[in-house]
Amino acid sequence: MGFYMLLTVALLLTSLMNVEATPVDQAERSALEKSGLGNRIQPRYDNCGDAEQTATSQSAWTKKPMMKNVKLPAIMWSQIAFKIKAKTKTKY
């Protein structure tokens, strides 16, 4: 039982050591938010529909992630690559 606990702790520690994230100071984060640097989502039906739909399409913003230099495990990269390949595959 003690061996498995030690093995679990060792695996958790090694997985935590592989994650590297560069912190962003609060001043830089607030400057990015105030400057409006984000990705605007452009719906295809921007000029169609009722006023409520237009109002929600005008406020559709996504923020860029603040973590830099994040290392993902290899299995996550393969899942991401699989999803991208599935989206770009064309049907004939």
Curated annotation (Swiss-Prot):
Cystine residue pairs: none
Gene Ontology CC annotation, any one: extracellular region
GO terms of molecular function: toxin activity
Keyword Secreted tagged: yes
Which tissues is it found in, per the record?
Answer: Expressed by the venom duct.
Q: Write out the entry's keywords from A to Z.
A: Neurotoxin, Secreted, Signal, Toxin
Lineage top rank: taxon: Eukaryota
Q: Which residues form the signal peptide?
A: 1-21
Q: Where in the cell is it found?
A: Secreted
Q: Which residues form the propeptide?
A: 22-39
Task: Tell me more from the record.
Answer: The mature peptide contains only 1 cysteine.
Protein name as catalogued = Turripeptide UID-02
